[in-house]
Amino acid sequence: MDLETKVKKMGLGHEQGFGAPCLKCKEKCEGFELHFWRKICRNCKCGQEEHDVLLSSEEDRKVGKLFEDTKYTTLIAKLKSDGIPMYKRNVMILTNPVAAKKNVSINTVTYEWAPPVQNQALARQYMQMLPKDKQPVAGSEGAQYRKKQLAKQLPAHDQDPSKCHELSPREVKEMEQFVKKYKNEALGVGDVKLPHEMESQGPNKMHIPGGDRSTTAAVGAIASKSAEHKRTQYSCYCCKLSMKEGEPAVYAERAGYDKLWHPACFVCNTCRELLVDMIYFWKNGKLYCGRHYCDSEKPRCAGCDELIFSNEYTQAENQNWHLKHFCCFDCDNILAGEIYVMVNDKPVCKPCYVKNHAVICQGCHNAIDPEVQRVTYNNFSWHASTECFLCSCCSKCLIGQKFMPVEGMVFCSLECKKMMS
């Protein structure tokens, strides 16, 4: 498929999840409706991951595409109908007999994802070492957490040009090269094993302190100093605490098998969240999720959330923006050369600020212009003028004077306060 055809096929999937309720805003949101270029809901401004959108098949396609053309093709299967790679995530179902008065019932627990290991007891042990609210049990808070992290850590628009907005043919080509590079150099999937099993594979798999692993002395050290170094070689690369005997550890092949992590410590170096499904990116001795690895390589547009492959872009408020995306967060008007106000780290034009966000003056009851000086006390504000910041009793100007605040009113003296009480 040529680049021109790829550009024409691009779309953001606006029908996907349409009308889904927002888990954060509840009834305040009319239902999910994707903004035409931002990755948020037009109604409530929350992301798609905050809405109750059923995306399991779509997420499996996304992760499947991520693993395509990598050594992790065993984790994907291609659909016979269209050849699309699908992620074969390992689902684990545990059955526990529960004793009742008359008979024995079966309690079934389904994990929406589990480490792809043959030893189910090891996978179960791994799950139990995760925080309870992050265990992906179907229908639980942990399953919702996993779903949210899949969307946050592995954005489809970080790997698939067709999920981006109006890329040029040159940008498509550059993005494809970028994706190919990180698949070859950084992408990996964690491996769950018992540390002593790794040691039994030989000195080339485990780090033995006190000598070069290729020397005879180092090999001999395995037998003679195993007890002395046991705590050192089994310490977590993240928290530095010792691994308990018999507990599983997570290994990252790109980091080398001399490093291991507690299951709960296998986290992104930037956001500190669990690496979803143990999918990691390795760079300069650190683990990253997909999003924050890409952020370390390319600027990201604060407007559309996509990586910037254009040579020209805007930097403002310590953030990066496509030239066409430095817009008012409320009305989408371009802000180049215009006055704007930052509201929750989002730029808002002056008219929208006055209409939607400006504080109201307690004196004149009008919105306070963002360029006008004001006086603020607790949650109350006034224009810093002789017409507005006055004693609520005698109308004396209080600018530069001591005052007594009482429930949105201000007084110049105790006498005035008593007269109004």
From Swiss-Prot:
Alphabetical list of Pfam families matching this protein: LIM, PET
Name one molecular function that GO assigns to this entry: zinc ion binding
Q: What is known of its domains?
A: The N-terminal and the C-terminal halves of the protein can associate with each other, thereby hindering interactions with ZYX.
Where is it chiefly localized? Answer: cytoplasm
Asked whether the UniProt record includes Metal-binding among its keywords, one would answer: yes
Q: Where in the cell is it found?
A: Cytoplasm; Cell junction, Focal adhesion
Q: What is this protein called?
A: Testin
| Span of domain PET | 92-199
The job of this chain, per UniProt, is described as: Scaffold protein that may play a role in cell adhesion, cell spreading and in the reorganization of the actin cytoskeleton. Plays a role in the regulation of cell proliferation. May act as a tumor suppressor.
Q: Where is this region: Disordered?
A: 134-164
